[in-house]
Amino acid sequence: VIFDVLRNWLEHQGLRVRLVRNITDVGHLTDDSDDGEDKLLKRAKVEQLEPMEVAEKYFWSYEDAMTALGVRRPDISPRATGHITEQITLVLDLLERGLAYESQGSIYFDVSASEAYGELSGRDPADLIEGTRVATRSEKRDPRDFALWKAAEKGHIMRWPSPWGEGYPGWHLECTVMSTKYLGDEFDIHGGGLDLIFPHHECELAQAKGADKPFARYWLHWNMITLGGEKMAKSKGIVIALVELFKKYDPMAIRFHLLRSHYRSV
């Protein structure tokens, strides 16, 4: 809703806006580090569906809810699974520049070699040591390093061929690739929830700058909707589906309610 208002205002000012909203249909693991299970695969097992069936189901459910709230669709909705070649190309570029390394069929971004890492969140990379939401994997040189490409384990359904064997892209990689493909190496605004500043957006920026892409000029982060004092999240079972709210309240009333507060307030 926030981005819809911003888009409308910018267009009202006479500016031409291209809005891109990516669809993460592979690579988003259940842990912010490089451990855990792909969220889409996990959901597919629960619902006994193919991963792409799950992606389609929730994509259209989300689109229907946004339409009810009066949110216009983006100009482009690229999917991570449709941009595997471009993601491999960026990994090869970062390897050539000495900003990444291969380990057991996976490729990791070398945080120690990046001048940009920590720039967005204001965190000192040296302070990110073991035990601070950074998992230690034996195949990493440094626990702070993050996956660009993951080797597919036996039985992993979503996998693609690559120069390093079959695998799948890391969560951060796809966003850097798709945003720069459709908006250029430098674009105006990148947004998301406050919880994405670190590590997700931090990693996106490090990847982009590592490939000499200036990336976003401005960052817009909004706060989370809370329920009982906790952030609403499916992973914690703290969630109310919009479709359920629509049964009780007019969607425009919900839109108005969401816009009553500053976008960074709780």
Regions found by a protein language model. Name each.
Residues 213, 221-266:
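Catalytic adenosine-cofactor/nucleotide-binding cores of aminoacyl-tRNA synthetases and other
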Residues 1-205, 209-221, 234, 251:
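NTP-dependent nucleotidyl-transfer catalytic core
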